[in-house]
Amino acid sequence: LDSLSFSYNNFEEDD
């Protein structure tokens, strides 16, 4: 898991 993926996942908070 790279930084970009993490940031994107963090930004897209889908419940």
UniProtKB/Swiss-Prot annotation:
GO terms for biological process: defense response to fungus; killing of cells of another organism. It is found in: Secreted. Its main location: secreted. Keywords: Antimicrobial, Fungicide, Plant defense, Secreted. The keyword Transmembrane helix does not apply. Strong antifungal activity against fungal phytopathogens. This is Antifungal protein 1. It comes from Arachis hypogaea (Peanut).
